[in-house]
């Protein structure tokens, strides 16, 4: 399995590499507190978004999701290579486009492409409180494999103690490998 960018087109979307012109669209959703609520980072400033965009342009793991009809970049899907022919998938979308099926459409296209390229397993981790995320994974055919209790923290409280969070782990297997 090569570590290459997954690029695809669906009926409504173009899944592609990031480009410099994405800065405003990227800032629009990475600066939104509700969008990044379950992410390991806080809402970003414009300068932080510029640095994030530089990294995204240079990596094969972040895929920009663009609307075909308007060419607006509305979110991203993460496909990171892991051990044993496995990929980790994640997604973040502009709140103005939630509930439109874009996350499902883009993930489905990338999962199909990954499996046709020999990927054996795709997994995702999410916060149990993020019901929309784990419902999406279940709709995509992922199965919940684990509920890890207080296994990770991103932030600390005022006394500098970790704020521990639970994690659900979901996976989907390629039946042809």
Question: Residues of each region from the PLM?
Answer:
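Soluble sensory domains of the PAS superfamily and closely related sensory modules
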Residues: 56-58
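Acyl-donor (CoA/ACP) binding surface of acyl/acetyltransferases
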Residues: 1-33, 37, 62, 66-177
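Conserved GNAT-fold acetyl-CoA-binding loop/helix
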Residues: 34-54
């Amino acid at each position: 399995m090569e570590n290459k960018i997954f690029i695809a087109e669906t009926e409504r979307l173009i899944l592609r590499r990031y480009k410099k012109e994405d800065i405003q669209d990227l800032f629009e959703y990475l600066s939104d507190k509700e969008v990044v609520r379950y992410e390991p980072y806080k809402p970003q400033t414009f300068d932080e978004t510029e640095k994030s965009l530089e990294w995204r342009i240079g990596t094969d793991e972040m895929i920009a999701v663009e609307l075909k009809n308007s060419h607006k970049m509305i979110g991203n899907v993460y496909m990171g290579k892991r051990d044993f022919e496995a990929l980790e998938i994640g997604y973040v979308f502009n709140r103005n486009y939630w509930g439109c099926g874009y996350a499902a459409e883009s993930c489905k296209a990338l999962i199909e492409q990954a499996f046709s390229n020999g990927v054996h397993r795709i997994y995702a981790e999410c916060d149990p409180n993020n019901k929309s995320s784990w419902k999406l994974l279940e709709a995509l055919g992922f199965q919940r494999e684990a509920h890890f209790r207080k296994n990770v923290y991103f932030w600390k409280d005022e006394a500098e103690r970790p704020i521990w969070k639970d994690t659900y782990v979901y996976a989907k297997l390629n039946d042809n490998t």
